[in-house]
Amino acid sequence: MGSDRARKGGGGPKDFGAGLKYNSRHEKVNGLEEGVEFLPVNNVKKVEKHGPGRWVVLAAVLIGLLLVLLGIGFLVWHLQYRDVRVQKVFNGYMRITNENFVDAYENSNSTEFVSLASKVKDALKLLYSGVPFLGPYHKESAVTAFSEGSVIAYYWSEFSIPQHLVEEAERVMAEERVVMLPPRARSLKSFVVTSVVAFPTDSKTVQRTQDNSCSFGLHARGVELMRFTTPGFPDSPYPAHARCQWALRGDADSVLSLTFRSFDLASCDERGSDLVTVYNTLSPMEPHALVQLCGTYPPSYNLTFHSSQNVLLITLITNTERRHPGFEATFFQLPRMSSCGGRLRKAQGTFNSPYYPGHYPPNIDCTWNIEVPNNQHVKVRFKFFYLLEPGVPAGTCPKDYVEINGEKYCGERSQFVVTSNSNKITVRFHSDQSYTDTGFLAEYLSYDSSDPCPGQFTCRTGRCIRKELRCDGWADCTDHSDELNCSCDAGHQFTCKNKFCKPLFWVCDSVNDCGDNSDEQGCSCPAQTFRCSNGKCLSKSQQCNGKDDCGDGSDEASCPKVNVVTCTKHTYRCLNGLCLSKGNPECDGKEDCSDGSDEKDCDCGLRSFTRQARVVGGTDADEGEWPWQVSLHALGQGHICGASLISPNWLVSAAHCYIDDRGFRYSDPTQWTAFLGLHDQSQRSAPGVQERRLKRIISHPFFNDFTFDYDIALLELEKPAEYSSMVRPICLPDASHVFPAGKAIWVTGWGHTQYGGTGALILQKGEIRVINQTTCENLLPQQITPRMMCVGFLSGGVDSCQGDSGGPLSSVEADGRIFQAGVVSWGDGCAQRNKPGVYTRLPLFRDWIKENTGV
């Protein structure tokens, strides 16, 4: 096949066999092929006729010896470096257009599989033979699977490349990653190959794929739900230092839906952690990975994925010796989508990404053309929006995106609205070949441009909110337009210099809430002084001196150097009797006490599930998110109060829950039932929920049922709780532990009070902030005692969240552990906007708890 076209590196069309053609575009390196170089040769000049002097002879001998040594060194370098071979492996697939897929191709031991695999290996060998820096170093290829389309062959190829050519070989394969061959290309009789795709992979993967001891193949049957698990699930852990894979198939013209029902692997933050990867092919090619998973997930987490064709590959690579049960998964086949998008012509309606709330498939494009009546305008409100891809900045949207009015949207976003200045709007959705997400749920609405939000306030973004949310100090509009040009309520709000209104209890809490820091101005102490959390000013020399000069311990918190100091009620005391200058040292992952006692008894405050579901603007807690939360039911009355689990035998609650009232003996432990691991009040018999009766109720002897001072109680269980993924204890803080003003903490409960209210079925959560004690006393004069703390509601995106009396305040501390800061006492349990709630300070009762429980 001659050609007059100039070629670089012999890169013109080459003829392989009976017509399979491959167009190489690669260049030689320095004009050398196959890395051949020559050793230097001595060029000895003839000596002059007159004999050399002794020194000349000696110099010649030395020079000759030096040249010999250089030659030997070069030879050693050549043998030890240039001839060192590096193993490189690529995996990929080849599309064969003149073959029809038969069922026998699913069995790697069938005659049909072996025959076609042999042809594929021959074709690969021919292709590589014409590629510089690859062909001479090709060792072997293996075919691992076939699938429809017409026939797709999945393979890996191994090369042994001289070390000095590795970089060039990788460049060559990177450039030729997608090889498009002429449609008429033929080799080996009528074997037609139209494309070859290859990607680099780990050589260990190839070695492991040759071991079929943990390799499984499953084919969907009709509409049946198929199940598979890791070896030994759930009674024994999956194998360590292993590679398992599951090749899933469906019928032609179908796609697969895969769901992980239970998922428990070693933590993601461990080096070389165990990893599950789902691929949209039958070969483990990174660019076709849909998701990578590690750690543990609650049952409610969305782990449903969809293929774009009739195959999926799931791999599990384990490196750790940790004992985890692994996963349980199901899959089924469903018809391939014939179209995506469409025309929407009603006045309002909804639409969503394919298979929402499951993950959308890769390689899909959808277009919705929306048209409302002529005299109206149209807007699209995205209620949920998750188009996030690992390592991809959300602002650029180079991969998956939604496009409206020429603007692309991607990443993870809270509710937002896009409007049109006409009665038409077009929404486009695109996903690429890798890493999918949940997608979106949207609604479109027609509106009158002169009154876009009848009876409501219109944000500049087009979103509608209730009128009473206007100028309440909370930014309900994402652009803060509901808080502009407001007149602040002097009794409840602070006027920022930028004219924003903020709750009074956020003033001087060391957090810049106004945005211009005006709520923190006038709170500072003079130069060379330190401002305590309670507002008191001290000389800087008194900070970190081992003494509680502030009175609230804030001058001794977060000191950089840990010193042994004189013991006070505000210093941490080790078991050996020594006290530390460091604030809150317990269970922070560092041994500060010389006897290590600050890191003992730390099996608490950690969730079993390392991943939590994503909820934007909601208050529903996830399953297992607060495993120490307890629901207390009074006989014949249902849920009444909350509590927290601190050990297998003991709960902490509020004393006011156990005051006899209306002829009912709330102080009688036999009248109560505790539900541990509960998430939904209507599912008290669900798996993972533990039901326990109470053996004893110990209310604090100083509890005052009029002022609610000393509002704390201890509850002993009749039968110990069993720790599980849904039931875990919370950490108790030391008596010296400080939860400073401005710190964000969480309150949880089902929103029920002792005297009424239906409450929520699903466990609720609310983020709150510790309020400066002086501010708290000013807001609630003559009502606050030193045993009480105030908090204010923090999450502006949610209207309110009612916690339960007796429930815990959960604070995330050092090392990610969660400590109980307080107990829900009185006021609004989760706090209302601009209204603080009051809670019992738990650190002040640490000694009392230990005296009565031993915990």
UniProtKB/Swiss-Prot annotation:
Source species, domain of life: Eukaryota
Residue intervals passing through the bilayer: 56-76
EC number, UniProt record: 3.4.21.109
Cytoplasmic face residues: 1-55
Membrane side Extracellular: residue ranges: 77-855
SMART domains: CUB, LDLa, Tryp_SPc
Membrane topology: Single-pass type II membrane protein
InterPro entries linked to this entry: CUB_dom, LDL_receptor-like_sf, LDLR_class-A_CS, LDrepeatLR_classA_rpt, Peptidase_S1_PA, Peptidase_S1_PA_chymotrypsin, Peptidase_S1A_matripase, SEA_dom
Domain CUB as annotated: residue spans: 214-334, 340-447
Disulfide bonds: C214-C244, C340-C366, C397-C410, C453-C464, C459-C477, C471-C486, C488-C501, C496-C514, C508-C523, C525-C537, C532-C550, C544-C559, C567-C579, C574-C593, C587-C602, C641-C657, C776-C790, C801-C830
Domain SEA intervals: 86-203
Residue segments, region Disordered: 1-20
Residue ranges constituting the LDL-receptor class A domain according to the UniProt record: 452-487, 487-524, 524-560, 566-603
Residues in Peptidase S1 domain copies: 615-854
UniProt-annotated location(s): Membrane
Any one GO biological process: epithelial cell morphogenesis involved in placental branching
Effect of H656A: Abolishes catalytic activity
Subunit structure, as described in the record: Interacts with CDCP1. May interact with TMEFF1. Interacts with iripin-3, a serine protease inhibitor from Ixodes ricinus saliva. Interacts with iripin-1, a serine protease inhibitor from Ixodes ricinus saliva.
Database matches in PANTHER family: ACROSIN-RELATED, SUPPRESSOR OF TUMORIGENICITY 14 PROTEIN HOMOLOG-RELATED
Family: Belongs to the peptidase S1 family.
Protein name (Swiss-Prot/TrEMBL): Suppressor of tumorigenicity 14 protein
Gene assigned in the entry: ST14
